[in-house]
Amino acid sequence: MTRRHGWKGLLLVVAALLSACGGSEQESVPDSGLDNSQEVLDFYASRPDLFTFATPADLPADLVWETGMDEPEIGSPEATKGGTYYESIEDFPPTLRFTGPDSNFSSRSWISGFYRMPWVVPHPNTGKYIPGIAESWAVDQANKKVYIRINPTATWTDNEPITSDDALFAFFFYLSEYIQAPFSNNHYSNEYTNITKFDDHTFAITMTTAKPDMAEYALFLGPVPQHFYKELGTDYPERYQWRYEPHAGAYFIDDQNIDMGVRIVLERKQDWWAKDLKYWRYLFNPDRINLSVIRDASNRYEAFRRGDVDMMRVATAEMWYDNLPDSDPDVAGGYIHKSTFYNGGPRSNWGLWMNASRHLLDNQDVRLGIHYAANWQLVIDNYFRGDMERLRTQNDGYPDFTNPDVEPRPFDIALAEQHFAAAGFTQRGPDGILVNAAGERLAFTL
């Protein structure tokens, strides 16, 4: 069972001025005396298998370069840019770092994840590749290699140009023990065998295996700003704790817009390098995004009702139908807009999960019987009031990998009893529970 392919949201349009933010307590300021440039070069030299320096003349002549420019636009030209979007977060971020200790926090997407651009992104509707930082790319499946050309106008949020050196430095960064990120260390160690620089805007990445989705392993990566991490060393977590890493996206955080423990405000770059490019020009419309800490769910709801927060995702039928019904004066009066919309993205794999190594559950007929005995539609109709749809598989929403021919097993007591009988449970005990010849009850605890 999963959420229907859609969201319910409450939209509240308010006109408000953002109060001034300040009082940022930065733990570290840039130290111009530190420069790890030589260490980086030495690392490249020590790994000639991983880092290759070539020339444009070394590029294969038969490469087929793609630009992804034939897909439909994203967003609407009628959307007005400007204003402030007010959002709540459950807790103040423990760090502004994108990598390393404590960096995987609940509001990470709002802080930077929503705005960071990889080399290439999938179109949200067609799933086809469209340009991010890359201007074009070429896939050499036979040699497990992807070639990438950087858009020469691409810049970091601090206005420094993005170059192939930042692509190479990403490998130094994510392989480094300084960042204290074992997953990243492991991923870059095991999935890639080489990165080759051809010029300031052209490079290639070689993967270890030619998987069906091999191209994504290169295209969905992104650069790391080498100039920003010249101070990278053993004190990385502390040194960069409250320093916002430049990225290629539309929003940035200024030190003056950090009110520790209270709020963080992001600002849109008015001269963002991609602001007039297809696929990006109708996105990222607010000038500012105000993230205020509201820890308690009831307080977040009240803040929304007051107009302090612009939108609230509704996760329960009780909230949608009982707490804020269509007859509510604010809804009926047009002050709050309730909206339901659908998408075709990956679904959360909600369901009843069984440990097949446990006693009784290690019998396939028992597991199949449970499938047929579980009345999910009753749960959907009564508990979720019909606002859910059952998953067809445990991983729906992956177009190239989800099998459209798989159907969930229906609620069918007769079939359930057949499978339970095949597992030896043919009689019922005094309490009505099925038992086998040894008197063992077919009962489980969730």
Q: What are the language-model segments listed below?
A:
Residues 176-184, 194-197, 254-265, 292-358, ...:
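Extracellular/periplasmic solute-recognition and catalytic clefts
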Residues 82-91, 135, 145-148, 167-170, ...:
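Short, well-ordered beta-strand elements
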Residues 52-73, 82-141, 172, 246:
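N-terminal lobe/hinge region of extracytoplasmic solute-binding protein
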Residues 135-180, 204, 300-303, 360-362:
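Aromatic- and charge-enriched surface segment that lines or borders ligand/interaction sites
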Residues 18-20:
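C-terminal motif of bacterial Sec signal peptides marking the signal peptidase cleavage site
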Residues 104-105, 110-117, 121-125, 220-288, ...:
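Gly/Pro-rich hinge or "lid" segments in bacterial periplasmic/extracellular proteins
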Residues 78-80, 184-233, 239-241, 250-257:
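Surface-exposed binding/hinge segments that line
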Residues 267, 361-446:
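Append "and occasionally in soluble cytosolic enzymes with long acidic Gly/Pro-rich linkers
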